[in-house]
Swiss-Prot record:
GO molecular function: DNA binding
Keywords carried by this UniProt record: Cytoplasm, DNA-binding
Pfam families: YbaB_DNA_bd (PF02575)
Protein name from the UniProt record: Nucleoid-associated protein PsycPRwf_1729
Gene3D superfamilies to which the protein is assigned, alphabetical: Nucleoid-associated protein YbaB-like domain (3.30.1310.10)
Lineage, top ranks: Bacteria, Pseudomonadati, Pseudomonadota, Gammaproteobacteria, Moraxellales
Family, as annotated: Belongs to the YbaB/EbfC family.
Biological role: Binds to DNA and alters its conformation. May be involved in regulation of gene expression, nucleoid organization and DNA protection.
Localization annotation: Cytoplasm, Nucleoid
Subunit structure comment from the entry: Homodimer.
GO CC aspect terms: bacterial nucleoid; cytosol
NCBIfam families: DNA_YbaB_EbfC
Length: 110
């Protein structure tokens, strides 16, 4: 195989990876994860691209101290971010599987 053929093969592979990654990003924008804090007192729904779609606060919390509400909101959002990151990693790994990329390279496309 000559150099020009290798270059063409590499370019074709790059285009395929880019198309798969774009498709995966669109898929992540449509998928949602949910997380909660305080045994469900605060719930967050977020897309796989880290866009918060819903925030639910149990009415009983509104009578408590604001510091508790703030802490629970932060905890719920952080839990949702973790879940969204896991979803993103899985989705992008599927999008780039079979491309012969070394381990850890899928993270470059997030």
């Amino acid at each position: 195989m000559n150099i020009q053929a290798l270059m063409q093969q590499a370019q074709a592979m790059q285009k395929q990876v880019e198309a798969n990654v774009e498709k995966a990003k669109k898929e992540l924008a449509d998928k949602e994860v949910q997380a909660e804090a305080g045994n469900g007192l605060v719930k967050v729904t977020m897309t796989g691209r880290h866009v918060v779609k819903r925030l639910s606060i149990d009415p009983s919390l509104l009578e408590d101290e604001p510091d508790l509400i703030e802490d629970l909101i932060a905890a719920a959002i952080n839990a949702a971010v973790t879940k969204a990151d896991e979803l993103s990693e899985t989705t992008l790994a599927k999008a780039t599987s079979g491309m012969g990329l070394p381990p850890g390279m899928q993270g470059l496309f997030g």
